[in-house]
From Swiss-Prot:
Lineage: Bacteria, Bacillati, Actinomycetota, Actinomycetes, Mycobacteriales
Keyword Coiled coil: yes
InterPro entries in UniProt: GreA/GreB_C_sf, TF_GreA/GreB_CS, Tscrpt_elong_fac_GreA, Tscrpt_elong_fac_GreA/B, Tscrpt_elong_fac_GreA/B_C, Tscrpt_elong_fac_GreA/B_fam, Tscrpt_elong_fac_GreA/B_N, Tscrpt_elong_fac_GreA/B_N_sf
Ranges in coiled-coil conformation: 15-76
Similarity-based family: Belongs to the GreA/GreB family.
This protein's name: Transcription elongation factor GreA
UniProt-listed SUPFAM superfamilies: FKBP-like (SSF54534), GreA transcript cleavage protein, N-terminal domain (SSF46557)
A GO MF label: DNA binding
Pfam families in the cross-refs: GreA_GreB, GreA_GreB_N
Record's keyword terms, sorted: Coiled coil, DNA-binding, Transcription, Transcription regulation
Length: 164
């Protein structure tokens, strides 16, 4: 049995994703009609339009399932308003293993939450690094597990609310 992970979203992101889901569901009959129209053109083996419409339908259905799962497991909250504490919705700056020159700035959120800001890396609060930093205060050092089984220390330099 798999455990459903809770995904944190702002109300704005939840509404945006719900709107996308509603549009995709409303578009189902359009794609079904396109498939039927292409099917009537004849030989399906060599019907590029038919295959393209079926592929589009598959991609759309996959996105619908992804959005339904995300929204069903979402915890809707407000973006953090305080600075200095790493919370979902915070842009954090950290350094690794005591090397203050090795810094990284990223958003603690879901990819969906940070999807509109291509310049900013996004780490999930459920990831090893994101989870280790949750509720850390500026100056706190935390340790997290790397994929190879070793651990790394990370120190929080700053945490600011994310504004999309």
């Amino acid at each position: 049995m798999t455990e459903t992970q809770v995904t944190w979203l702002t109300q704005e992101s939840h509404d945006r994703l719900k709107n996308e889901l509603d549009q995709l569901i409303a578009n189902r009959p359009v794609i079904a009609a396109e498939i039927n129209e292409r099917r009537e053109e004849g030989d399906l083996k060599e019907n590029g339009g038919y295959h393209a419409a079926r592929e589009e339908q598959g991609q759309q259905e996959a996105r619908i399932r992804q959005l339904q799962e995300l929204l069903n497991s979402a915890k809707v909250g407000e973006a953090p308003t305080q600075s200095g504490v790493a919370l979902p919705g915070s842009v954090v700056k950290v350094y690794y293993d005591g090397d203050e020159s090795d810094t990284e700035t990223f958003l603690i959120a879901t990819r969906e939450e940070g999807a509109r800001d291509a310049k900013l890396e996004v780490y999930s609060p459920n990831s090893p690094l994101g989870g280790a930093l949750l509720e850390a205060k500026v100056g706190d050092t935390r340790e997290y597990n790397l994929p190879n089984g070793s651990t790394m220390k990370v120190t929080l330099l700053s945490a600011e609310p994310y504004h999309s």
